[in-house]
């Protein structure tokens, strides 16, 4: 931000006279300054003082100097100023909108202490601080004030955030407090925010932080939640004073702080999120700054000083000029002022989110603003100052903007159309469309206000080329979709968005009504269409007619004018609307009827008075009449009855007008008497209902007001006596009977005997009613009444009287009914027949006269035929067996299917004449197959063939003809027919006939005869494709002969003979055509060749002009030269391309050379300026003398080349001496050198090099050595010879290099000698450094050929101990390596040992490795899977090593699924108490208890092994640090479980211990947290079942089935635990991952449980003992006492306890004695083993081994 001083608004005084406060108005038009004299000065935006007024004290008695103004702020509408004073009051002055308006106080707010600061952030809300520490709010609307929050400290400063919805107050104790009216979703906290080190007199709230400063000369920036962001410390600056005031820019991106003679400016850097100080503005003698005010648009900053001065500064980051028409002033990163340089108008463009404005463009005829930020898009209308900011992600600048609509900007990007309404910060809508053309999109945004509609925003656009979508942009939903049959090329909604006009590519204009979803085509050949602005009138052009729809609701009513031009536009203004028509070169205006236009607008706007006024100016026409009717309807709906009355008067509807006039008088009278709307009066409402013929509504309105008389009067006036009497009956009116009599008398007086009869009938007087009916001439009604009453039927005279009347009146059917009723069937039948009541006659005849039925059916059919009801007659004729009549009726009724059905039932003779008639019908419907079948049935096959022939269906006709005619006859017929067609010029039909009879050649001949070559070619291509090219060529030649060259061209080209075409045009002298064909059809150079020939035919200047025109002059010269036309080439180059002449000479020379004319060629080469080419020519021909002659005369530089060429010849002849001499003459010793090298004459090469090119001698020597190396053995010998030569010459270094170059190429002995010789020479004669290099080079090479000892000795000569050791190691000479390490450098002994170990490991020599590194050996055994050897070897090591590898082997076995082997491992080697092994022990235990087939006597040894291992582990744990740990306790539980399993297996081997085994299975259930719960319950249930404990078996097995279901479902949540309440069987157990019991055994259990549950004999209760608890539960539920488990059964020991030495171990005496007795009787070794284990586990057995007491 840069500050530039503009002007001084108020000059400073000599002494202290501080400006107390300043403020800018919200509209940027006014600036207020309050001076020390308490006077407010008002300035305009340009800095001119325009007004002033004095403030007043709270009480005049204290005088005008009794207070100071501490705060001042403009209202949001800029028409008021609030003044905060130290005499405890705030005044609000209304200053008005114009300068000079009277200043009046409109509000005042008295406070309890001095006002210290003040802000006016929102309408009606003033916020201010008091000296007592409170921050309060004054409401200008209610004239009341209230406290927002209070502190105990003086309020020194007050500021708001950028939006004005939050306030920040600074207090004398340094506290800064924040309060929000609306946090705008930021979620920031309220209340005390921070405690500043000093009173924050300078306080500003920017967008991203809070800036505070004061007397400590430090500026601190705080974050949104009060944490310190930055500190700017000026306390050490002797020039700086305290900071007195601060202000934030309107965008919140900059802050200015005032101190003494200085303004400090800070700018927020968004990318780094820090404040950065700009260069301070220092002004000498400005003194202390007391007030700052920033203009709302950010462009000006005003500064008030201690001496009363006010300075104005211009603020901006940068300025730019846009297209020399607009000035762009960036007053902040997020705020730009756009100024029109011509008009001076300004618009402030600002990002409300604080984003940096990156680029501003002015588009759309320089009216619309477009600007981008990183996250948003800014849009604006410069004319209306409406601005929008919407979220917008950058899309690479690919957006397209359309500004055709003044209310909305259309943005098109990546197939998506976005609409933004100017002035709205949300997108109006977004749709997908690929058609971004303003003519294919129509947006209407509140363009005409309508009655009852506040917001109307609609969009019409194309979804695809034939589908229009209409969207309500407010609701965001689709309100219509128009699918059209052809492409839409223009569309537009009317201004109200109710009608859509669109035109398709066929120039048809359609109108779509959105509410009714109806589409109407209103105009054809429409070239122009437009809605008249401000109305729903439509103007369109149809050819020479101008069409105008004044009332679009009646699209069939159109006004048309004849015009003689094209409509180019519409102009509306000055009270008239004109259609502009371009007639020739003049523009003619056709004026439309403004009244008709205005009428529609007035109607839509609901202004019916205006509409009436319009219509009264018009003459009555059909259009005007329609408008009056529309207005009358709308006026009635809106209850504007006077207007409706006027409408009906205009329409000539006098009755309605009079009725409305009376209604209006009633309404007016009510309005005068009672006030309000008279139309709400009940009589008015009832009369309006009567006007709409809604008499029931009128009745209801009357009766609601209890106006019964009025309701009855209404009906009487309308002569609606029935409704009148009904009202009287409903309300119990006393005049009811009188009404009825009056009604009857009125009926008789008006001769309404029928209605009177109905009245008498309803009252039950049948005779009177009949008499009246007969009098009225209604015998049918009399008959109906008689038929319903038996007593009247008995009156014979009456009945005869009625029947006579009926017959007289020819009401035969009714008479028949009466005769039938009185049982006179004969007369009834006659009457029915006369009255054509055949249905009743047939029904009666079936009962009374069956013989007559057939005749009646035929008569019925005849009657129906007379009535033209032929369809109905068919069935009656069928019933009457009149087939011919039925067929004719069916044919007459066009019931063809019925006719066919009836015909199929007739004999062939009868039917044959009718089939062709039906066939003709089907032929007319083009249902030829059915027609053919019918013709065939009617023996009219020829007609069928004719039918097919006339229909052009020759194939079917041919097929049919072949059936009934001989093939040759068919061919003759068709060919004859085809010839007739040919004569008539119907060639296509003739062709089809020829082709049908397989004679396409006749058709081809026909077309050729008539020169219809296209059709001829078509047929040839179809029937003789192999002859197509020949045909084209033949036709081409024919046409060429006839001079029809264009047609001939076509055929030549189709025959792929473009050259023939070119030749044809050349022969005819049509070079241009020939050139065209060659260019388009030939290859890349064909046209050039033709152009060349064309030019050659012209010759001279004409040829040059032509070739220049075609741009082919150079190409032609080249072509002529290339084709040996040198005369033409020289002619062209001479005339136009002189620079090409040497090139032509050159080509001519080359031509002559090829021809062998060397002397002429030499002359041409020299003319071409290419003597070197002549030299080369002679060299090529080995004419050395001529070559040298030309070179010396014309190209001295080539002399050397001639000599070189001659030398090359000498070399080829092996004349090396001559060649060398020539090369040296040519000063080319290098070439001589190369030739000797190529010839392998290295000695000569070295000689030449030494004499003439000594600088290359060394390189040549190296090359020679490389060459020798390549040659292998021969090369090696050369190296050795060379090395000896160098050695003899004392060149030891070179000799060494030669020796080193010797490679092992099959002769390793020689290589070794050479290398050793090199080493020997280097050690003897070369310096140490070189010596070292040689040895280090020779050593690896000796090792490479297996001479490790020799290499090691070399290394040892130079004390390279490690390299020597490495050589011995690589040679696997370990003893030598160890000896060298031991004797020369003991540090390498470990190095040798390590490599020896690695060697043994790599070689797999584990047995040898054991003696060196046993751990490595063991690891190698593990790697090789030799576990037995590994364990065997480890056994010989210490206990720790052994168990490391035992654990590894056990882990391997467990992974392989061999847990039993792992267990055996620990049985053999013991189970140490290593925590690392715990998981192994647990896994072995888990696998054992989960394994199948272990519930048997045979499994004893497995369980015993597990038991013994766990016992060993527990004994070891007691001695370890893990004693009594949770792991120890868990293993003790596992030991107990293993003991139970082992004891159970032992008991299962002895019959008498079955119950012991069962009890152990039951006892194991209390440990199901460690066991597979389903397996445990299954085993317990089966054991209980085996010993006859059915109750327990049922409960356990039922639980087992529940568990299997739970495993399938994957959850235990559904289990019922009620059976196991008050037991120690756990509920919370792990859910097994799989079933542990096979499917068959599960099904067996399921069947048993189902059987038992069906018997209902068992009680589902577990057995209980003397404790009242479950007998196997250790814990008594009632007492909580826990009993010890018996070592033999696991059951609780309640009495007869035998205790063992180890505490906690006991047995039940009975069980113990039983177990001992079983051992004694069975001598079971496994039981004895159990006893042995118990003795070991429990510290010995009880003293008495057997106890039977």
From Swiss-Prot:
GO biological process, alphabetically ordered: bone development; brain development; cilium assembly; cytoplasmic microtubule organization; dorsal/ventral pattern formation; embryonic camera-type eye morphogenesis; epidermis development; heart looping
Modified residues (Omega-N-methylarginine): 672
Pfam family, one: TPR_IFT80_172
Listed result of changing residue 493 to R: In BBS20; uncertain significance
Taxonomy, superkingdom: Eukaryota
Location of cross-link Glycyl lysine isopeptide (Lys-Gly) (interchain with G-Cter in SUMO1): 4
UniProt entry keywords in alphabetical sequence: Acetylation, Bardet-Biedl syndrome, Cell projection, Ciliopathy, Cilium, Developmental protein, Disease variant, Isopeptide bond, Methylation, Obesity, Repeat, Retinitis pigmentosa, TPR repeat, Ubl conjugation, WD repeat
Subcellular location: Cell projection, Cilium
WD repeat intervals: 14-53, 64-103, 110-148, 150-191, 195-233, 238-278, 284-323, 483-520, 521-559
Residue(s) carrying N-acetylmethionine: 1
TPR repeat coordinates: 593-624, 692-725, 809-842, 854-887, 912-945, 947-970, 971-1004, 1042-1075, 1142-1175, 1276-1309, 1345-1378, 1411-1445, 1447-1477, 1574-1607
InterPro entries, sorted: ARM-type_fold, TPR-like_helical_dom_sf, TPR_IF140/IFT172/WDR19, TPR_IFT80_172_dom, WD40/YVTN_repeat-like_dom_sf, WD40_repeat_dom_sf, WD40_rpt
Cellular component, GO annotation: axoneme; ciliary basal body; ciliary tip; cilium; extracellular vesicle; intraciliary transport particle B; sperm cytoplasmic droplet; sperm midpiece
Disease linkage: Short-rib thoracic dysplasia 10 with or without polydactyly: A form of short-rib thoracic dysplasia, a group of autosomal recessive ciliopathies that are characterized by a constricted thoracic cage, short ribs, shortened tubular bones, and a 'trident' appearance of the acetabular roof. Polydactyly is variably present. Non-skeletal involvement can include cleft lip/palate as well as anomalies of major organs such as the brain, eye, heart, kidneys, liver, pancreas, intestines, and genitalia.
Subunit structure of this chain's protein: Interacts with IFT88. Interacts with IFT57. Interacts with RABL2/RABL2A; binds preferentially to GDP-bound RABL2.
Protein family membership: Belongs to the IFT172 family.
Cited function: Required for the maintenance and formation of cilia. Plays an indirect role in hedgehog (Hh) signaling, cilia being required for all activity of the hedgehog pathway.
Protein name: Intraflagellar transport protein 172 homolog
Protein's gene: IFT172
